[in-house]
From Swiss-Prot:
Belongs to the lyase 1 family. Argininosuccinate lyase subfamily. NCBIfam families: argH (TIGR00838). InterPro entries: Arg_succ_lyase_C, Argininosuccinate_lyase, Fumarase/histidase_N, Fumarate_lyase_CS, Fumarate_lyase_fam, Fumarate_lyase_N, L-Aspartase-like. It comes from the Bacteria. One of its GO terms (biological process) is arginine biosynthetic process via ornithine. Its main location: cytoplasm. It catalyses: 2-(N(omega)-L-arginino)succinate = fumarate + L-arginine. Keywords: Amino-acid biosynthesis, Arginine biosynthesis, Cytoplasm, Lyase. The keyword Cytoplasm applies. One of its GO terms (cellular component) is cytosol. It is found in: Cytoplasm. This is Argininosuccinate lyase. It holds the Pfam family ASL_C2.
Length: 462
């Protein structure tokens, strides 16, 4: 089949070139955006009297037929068409004849793919944001049920201070909140229309780029045609934003793997989101969080891959940028299925509050409270209080106890400067609720955080 651009060529393209050069196997995913952009372009051409109203009507009707064929699975994608733009234009011309050949007036594939891909990226940005908001709802629902559920807060994966499970889950809600805000920022930054930039320097036709931007739902046209056709910042920003989302998912997934182990037993994953072993019949494996953890690596790779593609490209458009789409599409698909399955795995998991609270009785979680008591109530300098507390911990370990399990008499006998009332500050519940500073783990602060996060969510779920 003769190429639409083959006028100056004396030889046909080799079959090997067609296979190597074609992007149709993956950019056919842009069919909706391509047809949407072409409809807007046709309307603009008619408005500016570059084509007739009748020709515009024929083009719009033909594009609607092409859209129907694709969505019904009737459209025949031919590798010789190279890309989705040529495939749609070729079929349009088959359907409506000469009018179809006028659609590409005042347009290049350079600005055509720029607007198609940008619209795709912005749409996926919105979809991913919506999924994160749903995940946050699930996380906050869990947090609301466990405002007072004690668990060991950790640093260096060692027991540190008692916190509530609700407080711990709020931390993840805050991470995903930032992800949404990051995606919102990216969407706003890239919501500008490159269509009308043509190949690289604009067009001599009397086009109306403001009309195109409005018709396609953008804030305004882009400023510089050369930048417009060579820019892939919008794709890189989405890749980075997704990488951050997956990093946060991976951190939560890592904890789910730990929490579901026999050593922790903090949560039990449902059978629907667990797998078994081919040889060990007793096994119940946390494959979902393990895969979530592993999939973060592939989205990091997609980001680095496109950064590497873009780093040495001279202005303006280069064929190298054809390599932008597969990585973005893979990262989008990875993020969307990851967000969906994480939400369901969390919703269906059983929280073992008793195991969490029992774990708080190991690791001397209230040692800091004892040191603070010595400073505030016993007027002991902090460094000495730190030393005395270490002696109490050593005594408790010699007795095979946690410091929260020591009697007041035992503690008073370790150092004469320790005053009566010390036992009360070693209570795990009291320790948790004593941390009532803004952002702290007390029940009051955890409730306040949930309320703030819910208010933020409601503004975006309208």
């Amino acid at each position: 089949m003769k190429k639409l651009w083959a006028g100056r060529f004396l030889e046909a393209s080799s079959e090997l070139l067609e296979r190597f050069n074609a992007s149709l196997p993956f950019d056919k995913a842009l069919y909706f955006e391509d047809i949407k952009g072409s409809k807007a372009h046709a309307k603009m051409l008619a408005k500016q009297e570059i084509i007739t109203a009748k020709e515009c009507e024929e083009i719009l009707a033909g594009l609607e037929k092409v859209l129907g064929e694709i969505e019904r699975g009737e459209f025949v994608f031919k590798i010789a068409d190279e890309d989705i733009h040529m495939a749609i234009e070729a079929r349009l011309t088959e359907l409506i004849g000469a009018s179809g050949k006028k659609l590409h007036t005042a347009r290049s594939r350079n600005d055509q793919v720029a607007v198609d891909f940008r619209m795709f990226v912005l749409r996926k940005n919105e979809e991913i944001r919506a999924q994160i908001l749903e995940l946050m709802e699930t996380i906050l629902e869990i947090a609301s049920k466990h405002i007072s559920t004690l668990m060991p807060g950790m640093t260096h994966l060692q027991h540190a201070q008692p916190v509530s499970f609700g407080f711990h889950m709020n931390a993840y809600a805050c991470m995903f909140k930032r992800d949404v805000e990051r995606l919102e920022d990216s969407h706003k930054r890239h919501n500008y229309c490159p269509l009308g930039s043509a190949a690289l320097a604009g067009t001599p036709y009397p086009t109306d780029r403001e009309f195109l931007a409005k018709e396609l739902g953008f804030l305004a046209p882009t400023l510089n045609a050369m930048d417009s056709v060579s820019d892939r910042d919008f794709a890189l920003d989405l890749l980075y934003d997704i990488a951050m989302v997956m990093m946060h998912i991976s951190r939560l997934a890592e904890e789910m793997v730990l929490w579901s182990s026999y050593e922790f037993k903090f949560i039990t994953l449902s059978d629907a989101y667990s797998t078994g072993s081919s040889i060990m019949p007793q096994k119940k494996n946390p494959d979902v969080p393990e895969l979530l953890r592993g999939k973060s690596g592939r989205v990091y790779g997609n980001l680095l891959s496109l950064l590497t593609v873009m780093k040495g490209l001279p202005l303006a458009y280069n064929k190298d940028t054809q390599e932008d789409k597969e990585g973005v599409m893979d990262s989008v698909e990875t993020a969307q299925i990851s967000l969906a399955i994480l939400k369901e795995a969390l919703k269906s998991a059983t929280i073992n509050a008793k195991a969490m609270e029992e774990a708080c009785k190991r690791g001397h979680l209230t040692a800091t409270d004892l040191a603070d008591f010595l400073v505030r109530s016993c007027e002991v300098p902090f460094r000495e209080a730190h030393h005395i507390t270490g002696q109490v911990v050593a005594y408790a370990e010699s007795k095979g106890k946690d410091i929260s399990e020591l009697s007041e008499a035992e503690i008073l006998g370790i150092d004469s400067r320790i005053k009566a009332g010390v036992k009360e500050v070693l209570s795990l519940k009291n320790s948790m609720n004593a941390r009532n500073s803004l952002g702290g783990t007390s029940s009051a602060q955890t409730k306040a955080q949930i309320k703030t996060l819910h208010t933020w969510l409601k503004k975006r779920l309208k």
